[in-house]
Amino acid sequence: GLGDVYKRQIAVSAYSYMALVPVIQPPIMRLLTTKHERLIRMKPPRVVSHTEKVMFPIIGLLLTCFLVPSGLPLLGMLFFGNLLKESGVTRRLAETARGPLIDTITILLGLTVGASTQASEFLTIDSILIFALGALSFIIATASGVIFVKIFNLVLGKDNKINPLIGNAGVSAVPDSARISQVIGLEYDPTNYLLMHAMGPNVAGVIGSAVAAGILLGFLM
């Protein structure tokens, strides 16, 4: 398995990529799209019923338990938090989870990762290679998302085109990737709001990456 040193290096690299989303993604998005594509206006998202909102985390949690149990620590928390919010009967718990609790956990996680990473361990060739590999995967994921939308548009009707600027949101940096879609879209059309469209692939990216990681861990363990 991965040693503690590599785990710390990977954790620091992951946080670095999250912070670098506004730097890495916009040039790739502009490079791979035309001005016409950036101006595509999408239909408003459909209204989701309360029943669907409640059933989604329940079904997702059950499928994770059966199919990818090793991904449960991450996806379980995602679905549990979603259920707290959407159920409508645990408002105080939902407010605590998305406010004081997540702030406390974020501080403790940052302190733990930072305190356990010494310069002598982190500033090594292995660390640089890990960071470079992660950055490359980040770039490939961003480009792949944009290109996939462009390919998908080839088979869609004129009125159902998807703005390729939301393709970058498939990278599971929530909600930063979706915000970048919104910011770049507003640069070319101040009335074209892509945020809610981009949140779909953004959350799907979280679920997909966690499932993929769970499957990989299943093979390694």
Predicted region positions:
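Short helical (or helix-break) motifs at transmembrane helix termini and adjacent helical loops
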Residues: 23-27, 171-187
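Hydrophobic transmembrane alpha-helices of secondary-active transporters
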Residues: 81-84, 102-124
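Entry/N-cap segments of selected transmembrane alpha helices
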Residues: 13, 17, 119-146, 198-202
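Juxtamembrane and boundary regions of transmembrane helices in multi-pass small-molecule transporters
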Residues: 8-38, 144-158, 201-221
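Short, small-residue-biased leader/transition segments that mark boundaries at the very start
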Residues: 2-6
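Membrane-embedded hairpin module used as a gating/binding unit in multi-pass transport
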Residues: 16-89
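The feature identifies polytopic integral membrane transport proteins across all domains of life
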Residues: 7-13, 92-96, 131-132, 156-169, ...
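Transmembrane alpha-helices that form the ion-translocation and gating core
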Residues: 1, 107, 111, 116-119, ...
